[in-house]
Amino acid sequence: MKKHLAFVAVVFSTLVGPVLAHAQLIEKTALTLDGAKKIAAVAEAKAKAEGARVVIAVVDEGGSLLLLERLDDTQVASVNVGIDKARTAAIYRRPSKVFEDQVKNGRVSALALHGAVALQGGVPVIFDGKVIGAIGVSGETPSQDEDIAMAGAAVAATFTK
């Protein structure tokens, strides 16, 4: 019996010990509502300067909506498209244009990726080399949507912890 308990103790410490020695939690930097407002404000200023009628959606790292703006006279359909572009950029940690380019190049399997929208205009928000959220813009041409989104995302370089 003692040998059996000793054996179990050795196996337990060998297999479980290293797992317990590692941290079970990590610290993450999260995008705040204030940060989302700053991102949207820059994007909105660029859109208005260009006379663009767009929806601006800002999501957190997991793709949950933090802020949504629909500029005056923007088509209603752009609301969901803008959110989907932002979510795509957040959960896949790359611009939504990547998926659009894949489809254009014949890789239609990109359309089957869960939660991915193959439309240009979603851009990750990066702070300290990590994706902390994303911005999606919809309502104008694909390249104009992306330019507005990139302007908003760029403000993250000024953020502080």
Where are these regions (language model features)?
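Flexible, solvent-exposed loop/hinge segments and secondary-structure transition points
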Residues: H22-K161
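Bacterial N-terminal signal peptides
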Residues: A6-P18
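Positively charged n-region of N-terminal signal peptides that target proteins for export
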Residues: M1-H4
